[in-house]
Design a protein with these regions (language model features):
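A general structural signal for well-ordered alpha-helical segments in protein cores
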Residues: 3, 7, 58-59, 88, ...
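Short, flexible active-site-adjacent loop segments at beta-strand->alpha-helix junctions, enriched
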Residues: 1, 28-33, 107, 121, ...
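A short glycine-threonine-serine/GTX helix/turn-capping micro-motif
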Residues: 46-52, 145-154
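Contiguous beta-strand/loop segments that form the cofactor/metal-binding neighborhood of enzyme cores
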Residues: 60-133, 150, 161-169
Length: 197
C-alpha cells in the first residue's frame, strides 16, 4: 500500500493539515480463509494468523497516517483458534499526540477493507484502503470531494518500480518505506502476539 499513487495524495493532504489535527483512525480488513489457503493462513509454523497475514496492512496504514509508532496497544478482543493462531483481533492503539486508532483484522469473516481518518477540521474515508484508488475528503464548510487515483495495472507495479528505482540509484532501502518502518512494524506485531500468550 505504501507506493500506491493515492497514498502520495493522502500524505500530501495530511501534511498540509487539510483535515486538521488527526484525532482518530479506524481500519478493518477481513475475509474467510478456505481450502488450501486456510492451511497456510492458520498454520503457526508458516506465520499463520490474521495479524501477520493481513493485520500488517492495517498497521502499515496507521503508520502511513501517523508517521509514528503507537505509545500503547491494547487488545480489545482476540480469538485464538484450535491451531493456536489468531483468526480475529481488535486492537486499540494510542499515540503520543493523543490520537487513537482501532484496527480489526480477521481471516474468519468477510469485512470491507475500509478506513477512516478523523481530524479536527474534517475526515477522509477510503472505501478500500488496501487496493486504494479512491478516497472521500470531507472538510468542514465544504462539499465532500471524491479523489481518484487509478492504478496502471493492479497496484503491485508501483512496488516494482520503487525497487527498480532504488537499485538503479544504489540505495539499500527505499525512502518511502524504510528499513526503520519494516523493523517497527515487525516489532509491533511481535509485541502484540506476545501479549496474547
Amino acid at each position: 500500500i505504501w507506493f500506491l499513487p493515492l497514498y502520495d495524495r493522502l500524505r500530501s493532504i495530511l501534511q498540509q493539515g487539510v483535515i486538521g489535527e488527526i484525532k482518530h483512525i479506524s481500519c478493518q480488513y477481513g475475509f474467510v480463509a478456505t481450502g488450501a489457503r486456510k492451511e497456510r493462513k492458520f498454520n503457526p509454523a508458516l506465520g499463520g494468523g490474521a495479524l501477520l497475514d493481513i493485520g500488517i496492512y492495517n498497521l502499515g496504514f496507521l503508520r502511513i497516517v501517523t508517521g509514528n509508532e503507537p505509545q500503547n496497544v491494547e487488545t480489545q478482543k482476540v480469538h485464538i483458534n484450535e491451531y493456536g493462531t489468531d483468526d480475529y483481533s481488535c486492537l486499540k492503539l494510542t499515540y503520543n499526540d493523543g490520537c487513537t486508532a482501532e484496527s480489526v483484522q480477521t481471516i474468519g469473516q468477510e469485512l470491507k477493507r475500509n478506513a477512516r481518518i478523523e481530524g479536527t477540521k474534517g475526515s477522509i474515508f477510503l472505501p478500500d484502503f488496501q487496493h486504494a484508488e479512491t478516497m472521500i475528503l470531507e472538510v468542514e464548510g465544504k462539499e465532500p470531494e471524491t479523489i481518484e487515483c487509478p492504478v496502471d495495472i493492479n497496484g503491485f507495479e508501483y512496488e516494482i518500480r520503487e525497487v527498480s528505482r532504488c537499485v538503479k540509484l544504489g540505495y539499500c532501502s527505499s525512502d518511502v518505506y524504510t528499513a526503520k518502518d519494516s523493523i517497527a512494524l515487525t516489532r509491533l506485531m511481535y509485541d502484540i502476539r506476545m501479549s496474547w500468550s
